[in-house]
Amino acid sequence: MRVPLRLLLTLIIAAAIAGCGFQLRGTKSGNLPYKTMYIALPETADVRIWMERYINAAGSSEIVDDAKLADATFQQLLDSRQKTILSVNAQGRVREYRLQLNYTFRLVNQKGQVLVAPNEISLTRDITFDDSNVLAKDLEEGLLWRDMNNDLVNQIIRRL
């Protein structure tokens, strides 16, 4: 008698979750309302590479190489990355750094009309530093910048 009760309870919970529109973060289709899109960034820019991956994976929009052929053009207005000292130890050596990424973008159509007003995204990560582990901390910093780029592109795609 316990097995059918558990099964029934599981089915009720699953129906309630599905009924409220819950989706796992990675399973959303991410459909953009634009059929074609131009990304006004150099081909080697990290943000462009990550955006192309997300948009191509969603399959709802096509990335074009000419702004005249695009329904929407992504324009970067600001890309500021800073590494500042957060704290020092008693000997005056750095203990922590703060990594800051400030990014502003907008989306315009072929006529130059603004489709998405300028949006500012600010991301911050703190990293500890140790003189005896310089190489490891350098790798950790690189991973944090990469993680911040990933978060940045996720937020950009959601705002488009």
Q: Which ranges hold each PLM region?
A:
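A structural "domain/chain start" motif
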Residues: 2-3, 18-60
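Surface-exposed short loop/turn segments
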Residues: 75-120, 124-142
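Bacterial N-terminal signal peptides that target proteins for export
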Residues: 1-9
